[in-house]
Amino acid sequence: MAVDGFELAYDRVGSGPAVVLLHGWPGDRTDYRDLVPLLSGCEVVVPDLRGFGHSDKHAADPVAQYSGPAQARSVADLITSLGISRAVVVGYDIGSRIAQALARSRPDLVSALVISPPVPGVGTRVFGPGPLREFWYQAFHRLPLSEELIDGNPDAVRAYLRHFWEHWSGPQFTLSAEHLDHLVSVYSPPGAFTASVQWYRAGAGTTSAAASETAPAPEDRLATRAVVLWPEHDPLFPREWSDRIDAFFSRARLRFVDGIGHYVPLEYPSVIADEVRGFLADDPA
């Protein structure tokens, strides 16, 4: 069933308590291929988000159709259409933002969150000299020039994606040639790269959005159980930015994860599996 005209491609593996895995940019649902086998005894659902992988890609208004709430609508519909009543939802990068949006809009569907940055609380620190050197790509993605230079050009796609996979990962991680080839294959068809950056054109998770976030009243904080896995070597999100989680989440726990970078599901999948199983042990429904 399509939501707003978008159908999501997804993998569904196993049976048991439900776990939904939401990927980041510049990835797709294969970001979780090392985590899924660690979740035996669970029903694991891994979609490609709107505009990614093998899911629908429409030249629609970005704000209306590619924002966090819009992406969350598709994930919520997928969960309910599969007959799942509640799930532990995992997300990193934009998948983290979408998981949080889902927990806010449909708390009945989300039993717990296992997420890594971004999370709210950064504020105007995002405009410091260091962050500005890292977040240039978000402004670039909003320019027509980005699609003119990259969209539909496999060599340009390969060089561009490789930069982020190398720069954002920890010192012990190297993306396999096979995985990079796969990502190039799904980001290279005409329109695919442009669809993937509609998230940024919607203003979702951008530096300006981070700077404008204000803490809610204590009673309005996100009440879903959550753990925030904060990597040691993520150049986008230094650990000192973890100091305001309690201002936005009422039941969140912070866990620093040493030795890894931005791509937690690929660099340290077992830490996610451990947290998922911990939540399920407390509340297996």
List PLM regions with ranges.
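Flexible "cap/lid" subdomain of the alpha/beta-hydrolase fold that forms the substrate-access gate
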Residues: F6-L8, A18, T30, V45, ...
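Conserved acidic functional residues
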Residues: G24, D93, L266-E267
